[in-house]
Amino acid sequence: MKKILSLMLVLILLVGALVGCAYSSKAGEDPVVTAKNWIETQIKKNTLFSFDYAGKEYTEHIKSWEKTVEEKENFWVVTYTNGDVVAWSEITLDDEMAAVEWTNYFKNNGSVDSPVISDIQAIDSVVQVENPVLTSAQGSNSLANDFQPFSIDLNVEESFKMASMGGRSSHGAFPYFDICNGEYGIIGGIGWTGNWQAVFSAQDSNVRIQAGMQQTQIALHAGEQMRTPMVMLQFFKGDQDAGHNAFRQLVLKSYTPSDASGEPIKKAMMSIGVSSVAGYGIDELLNQVAFFEAINIQYDSLWIDAGWYGDIKGDNLNTGVWREQVGNWYFIPEAYPDGNARELGDYLASQDKEFVLWFEPERAVYGTKLTVEHPEWFISDEDNPKQEFMLYNLAIDEACDYLIDMIGTIIKDSKVTWYRQDANFEPESRWKTADKAEGENRVGITEIKYITNEYRFLDGLVEMNPGLMIDSCASGGRRLDLEMMKRTIPLWNSDYTTHPDTATADGNRALCYNLTWWLPIHAGGGANVTAWDTIYRFRAAMMSGMQINIDSTKLGVVRNTLIEQYYTCRDFMTGDYYILQQGFDKEIDTKDACYEFYMADQGKGYLMAFRPENCKTESNSYRLKGLDATATYELEVADTGDKLTMTGEQLMTDGLKVTYPRANLSLLIYINKI
């Protein structure tokens, strides 16, 4: 009997070692306490991350490493040493937001290659959530269901895997998730702008989370160092909306860049854009700015998109051949005779306007200036070395330094205040080509060096141009991971709207409002959805930032009214947010929708309600959330001035009845606590 009990104890301990150790949280516990206890448990049990070493699995080899723990206030460095190889984690606890963030590193201090480090999981840990339901979202695929949430009951599915594709972090999958049960839970994010994968496995009330790069099998060279993706977990109590609103505030605090004043950005912009038209030279642009002033249109920035650069002359100025010129990063001489846009930048600055300028530095056309001058800095397709598009190899430090100086100088000379970075290219296959050139046991090293230098490049531009703000586009919303969010604001959240034959206002509305559930600051597209000719289309894209094209400024009185409403509503977009009703997939264009933004500390906010063109619903009651049940609220329809008074309890219990006199109608309703 004693032998049986001993065997059972060994099995229990073995299972615990294999799956990590979960701190047992409770529904009513302070999330900060849960977060701190959880991270201390992972440090103690060596269950924060994992990797195979010299052919041995993590649980077989980790106990042979020498371990040290350095702890300061809410910061830990956990170091493992095995001969000349060092692995360590740098961990931070935000004790206001109940959030834990860490990044893992490896270094070979020896004089020869290290043993192979493989299957690196940036997180390999267990969290305890009873009856766990996993929720994430679709990635950016240029579809109406971009960022549409989906849920997996882990008690039923037991295991679920998701992964990005092509080498861009939110293409095909979304690097954020929550695991909750209606009473408490965690919300997490991955900080890696390349390929990643995550696996969620449940057993009883434990959920094992494994996430990292998709492929790693690396022998580090002498003196070489590498990092893993960053991981963040935020603990919360309450329902799923409580978790998402806590996460939105965390993003605003810790994963949003600062503006020129040094303060975290709280909004995007109303931008007027010149899109893919090379013929707009300096004189034409100055004339356009004068036109905006003449018609008294309110806006924040002038946006010059692709097409201002390269060898374009004469009759070709207006052809918009922007793809053919990437790699020729100099202003079109005929359109910009001074070689820069300084006159425009100076004028916009004098009017307190921002200047957005587009680049795509990671891709170049074979034969352009940069590929000719530095062919050693480009990765071609393995089977077609002279393929049209080549990848600029940021993994090379010298190439990264050169790019910082070249683009940083263009920005400085033209007084650009927003650097808009596109990336219309899937780098994955080129990374693999470069890995093969490195020799054996170097799988994943190019991606690691490339992404590490991607961050160094962006940080270098800001260091060279203090106050510079950055937009990450990547074919519209395909680089939305936490590391990129630290540095950028997505001003174009999806390329869905660049397909006018298939895109609809409601498809645009769905992807914009779904992304807002996770990320509070981004800009809705819409410039190419037929026209900005209706109130409905405008409100469908009304996020923290918006873009309208020059032709869209000719909207008469409605234009100024809509823009005034946008500026009023924008102030509430960093508050609490609730999706009260909407349709998914085929129902996007047939089901009514209602969204709520509310600033609890101000007692103010608004509802945005939509009845799509193909929706038969003539009225519906929407139950509001997050209000003070004991307070009285005044609700005002923005377009008519009609007002209604109700208590918070009535609004949250019975709901607000909204009547739609017709289809293709949107209603903006202001909320004011009185």
Question: PLM ranges: what are they?
Answer:
Residues 104-106, 348-350, 398-482, 489-490, ...:
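Active-site and adjacent substrate-binding regions of carbohydrate-active enzymes
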Residues 28-205, 214-216, 632-640:
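Polysaccharide-binding surfaces and accessory modules of carbohydrate-active proteins
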Residues 218-237, 664-672:
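Short Pro-Gly-centered flexible turn/kink motifs
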Residues 267-405, 418, 428, 435:
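Aromatic-lined carbohydrate-binding/catalytic grooves of carbohydrate-active enzymes
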Residues 453-644, 658-660, 665-667:
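Active-site-proximal substrate-binding groove within the catalytic cores of carbohydrate-active enzymes
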Residues 17-29:
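Sec-dependent signal peptide cleavage junction
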Residues 1-7:
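Positively charged n-region of N-terminal signal peptides that target proteins for export
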